[in-house]
Amino acid sequence: MSKKVKQKPEVHEYQAEMQKLLEILVHSLYTEREIFLRELVSNASDAISKVQLTTLTEKNILDKDVELEITISFDEDKKMIIVEDSGCGMTKEDLLENLGKIANSGTLKFLQQAQAENKTAENLIGQFGVGFYSAFMVADRVELVSRSWQENSKAWQWSSDGGGQYEIIPVDYK
């Protein structure tokens, strides 16, 4: 039988080999490489749904008159697939919170907040926070440029090669 010690225990965070964890996560959830496109389009659709819902209650929205759309294009020279949307966008803090933490869903948080405020938001798709990472099945590097719907927001670029680190840098936005 062990004696009780009157000392506070040390608290430690789990450590993970992110590249290996991402690989296991992505390849166990997705069996077909093409699924990444569906996941990115789903994220874009959620971003548009969020901005539609937000415009019902918020007045200070950047680019109120912008057409809500999702565009998929290809840059063969750079070997890039580009998925663009005119949805809610993300702040630097959103990028850190939602892309810097695997399985952390900004959509789930938005849905919970909307339900708490009695808003209808059932058409949001992504709620598990892992679909975005399926892009690493087909890409050596993933880049995301985003600017929040909020007035005076800066644009930020998030990029990673799927290893243990990612980068965030402010960028000019067209």
Predicted regions and their residues:
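GHKL (Bergerat-fold) ATPase N-terminal catalytic module, capturing the glycine-rich phosphate-binding loop
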Residues: M1-K174
